[in-house]
Amino acid sequence: MTNSKNRFGNKFIGAHVSAAGGVDNAPLRAREIGANAFALFTKNQRQWVAKPLEEKTISAFKANCALLGFSPQQILPHDSYLINLGAPEAEKLEKSRLAFIDEMERCQLLGLNLLNFHPGSHLEKISEKACLSLIAESINLAHQAVPDVVAVIENTAGQGSNLGWRFEHLAEIIEQVEDKSRVGVCLDTCHTFAAGYDLRTPEACETTFAEFERVVGMHYLRAMHINDSKVKLASKVDRHHALGKGEIGWDCFEYIAKDSRFDSIPLILETIEPELWPQEIEQLRKYHLSSIA
């Protein structure tokens, strides 16, 4: 089964699937739900250290991706939740940086060229500016250690001391990254909305993405997480919901599915009812295909 333009159009739509039993199972699970993109953890996301990937697992992953038509630009690995690339304490920062480099190396071994991550938190111990500089420095160090892999910064909801919820935070990090060809952004619709950027109508989407273009630049958009929100606009709380069941609503997701600016990047569901993923993927694809018919 190969990736067909007629069947999938120009959108890479999928979900964050389980890699239980080995990362080579992830592409199989993605295709089971009708996806032509997927996200995964390449190791346990709640542990600092994982055993190295075995050669047979690497080979099986690559073979399954080739068989099912998943190219590297359709796959969005996510790093460990423990990593804080802007950590104010030297020991935690060093531990985070080493773990992030390991995550990049795992991506490289799997033939993948994107790594999605949450930027970092100042923990109210250093200034926002200092934290953003540490994050950029962490990316630069990872780039020096591992070739090719792109660091894809995920915007956040603004919960606690997490940075990355304002587009200006993302721009400030990118400004300090030396190799700008290897840094990008993953916009999470739930996080964007919770941070205060409205997405409930086509007009609101136009305004929000125009602001992203002005502050960051659409050319840095390398992926999206497609999630509705359980909480209201500007709540600064990260609570995902199934598409159409939350505060954002289907208009936003139809807008993204039909807009060519979001073609050819992973559009990844992290919605809370995995049993609905096949229907959510199908609906997004219907919107997209109707726009190019």
UniProtKB/Swiss-Prot annotation:
Please give the Gene Ontology molecular function terms for this protein.
deoxyribonuclease IV (phage-T4-induced) activity; DNA binding; DNA-(apurinic or apyrimidinic site) endonuclease activity; phosphoric diester hydrolase activity; zinc ion binding
- Record-listed Zn(2+) 1 binding positions: 78, 118, 154
What Enzyme Commission number does this protein have?
3.1.21.2
Task: Please name the GO terms of the biological process aspect recorded for this protein, alphabetically.
Answer: base-excision repair
What are the required cofactors?
Answer: Zn(2+)
Task: Give the family, as the similarity comment puts it.
Answer: Belongs to the AP endonuclease 2 family.
Record's protein name? Probable endonuclease 4
Instruction: Write down the species.
Output: Vibrio vulnificus (strain CMCP6)
- Name the gene that codes for it: nfo
